[in-house]
């Protein structure tokens, strides 16, 4: 065994071995328990960042741990390779997205291999290949045939820069999440999948996700947004027209003083035809930001239509207003407004001088709406002559009474509604899977026939940044169906389509069908899924929805796609900038910043770059290109080795919290690995060891062996159950301190160290696999570490012969005594009283009280 640790040499040899022996390729094996470990696949942007490294290291640690448990472990990888960044890069370079994407895949694949991740590369997929999206297209046509797909014109969030539709979740502070362009509203026809048909099941099944973080589950419950209310009909005065309103607070119905409708409501458009001010306001609303954050903070504005609605119970006439806070694509596009009991309605009524009528009050006092609305569920009063029986009722009784009356009169009904909207899957971009629908000359819309699938996206195109090549190329859109001319759909799928079922395709990536059900049902559901919490309400919801679609198509037999979910935190790094002569901030890499001065709390006071510019330190922030504070993983691997980078990633922070990148921490991880190498090297150099005989161990040897097996127990629990990888590493480091100080004088000393090194090598194998692979062989094992088993805890070794008891006199520690592990309270008390240090502090005092905490503490109170 070479004396010095050489990571580049070791890692290259081990990676070559894994590749040549196809170590991580697996097939279905009914005789073994399976374990499917999956990290969210990357977008091939060009280079891995530290966020990728953290995600994939966590996944690899879990997968390797489960392999040593004897399980048949699948850990695949692939590429989420459609999307806007490739298009934008192609536009900038006047080329096609395809070569840019495939070059990035090749580069990043090599980076993943350098980090030693144990992937089954035989299952690699790229979502931009026809072999993949063919089956997505096929499945979409089947959903269409089942009535799960429809096309309609709708108001959408539109990014003028990227020329594409954005989901509400993709609009941040009124701007596009990708390019920060202000978002406008636009009416376009697009395709939808009826996720709302599964809203109830998606909501109820959240309760079965025992292995998912509570935060993710809460976010999904809120996003699905189930509510129970009443949908009622309001008639328009002097008209045959009527419109529906849904409310979850029917108890406030008798306090309605106006009705607000969306700018896109048919009544609004009708009224605008003779009202120029209203028409202008409607145009203003169409271009407004409709995200929740914007709606919550924007000024509430409206214009009266001149129309009046008839209250469904009292018959009272109330004005109809168009308001910017009502959306046509949410609910019915109309809301009953009760300013006395809704703060938004209150502010609007105050602004426009509208009537307020209180009809709910606290049970034990009068209601005051002089300064704000009373929004609690109190007791009804002031209900009027049309329904005086409501007075005195509380919320649920009032709900039931109003429901009964409206139902009996045919004016309303109880209803469950969801905040969740159907999934708009159309995108007006090129680099995506073509939507497999055609339109015949007579206007008939139909799925592309199965024998014409896949509808292949042409890759040999040039992006001009003005129009999608498949929209510009009329010849591409022209096709025939049964000899009749037809035109292809030129929209492409939302890329969330590809990422919603990739996990299932890994089970049979080369099958000439969407899924091989036998293989899919062997591997699914995923046992461990790993990815960022930012995906909670988009990918992770679509992921669950798609699995239920696959189930109902008979392709899988489980209800949920993943048993356990770990959401890793972000990676942060120091951020520095200076202001140039034009007043612009220039961000400087932390690798180029020299800290000149720190305050007494260790905070940076002064720093400069290599050019002498004095830098402003802004603290730790998420690694990003915009702040130039990303650390290239490849640079760190070349400097310290992959195992060191992996160890730091696992040790620096609990997995679900943010990780602060500190190169000093990386150096510390590197020193630890070198210490372990040196300990093993010295042990091997001393020659073979004899068998360990636990019956001959001294008390100190027993104590060391106890520490070893306590560590095995803790690391097993930390990795396998708690997933607290940082504390697992800390436990091994603490054990290493004991091993480094242990004498190596006798044969049993060396035999004990041999047992410890064998265990430590396997305990660390999931985290530092290259070194562990090498040490395993150097320690004399003939098999490969991947084929070994996780170390077992020797329960007998954990039994202590004696205990160290702390003795206090009047709250101060005065002695530490060693007692038999099974010593009685009386025996411990006597030993404590007999101790010379204790006697010294009891001189002249009488012991009044004795407190004994078994195995830990003896406390004497004396005066």
From Swiss-Prot:
Annotated positions binding ATP: 625
Keyword presence, Ligase: yes
UniProt cross-references to Pfam families, sorted A to Z: Anticodon_1, tRNA-synt_1, tRNA-synt_1_2, tRNA-synt_1g
BP GO terms, sorted: leucyl-tRNA aminoacylation
GO cellular component: cytosol
Record organism: Shewanella denitrificans (strain OS217 / ATCC BAA-1090 / DSM 15013)
Descriptive protein name: Leucine--tRNA ligase
Keyword Ligase carried by entry: yes
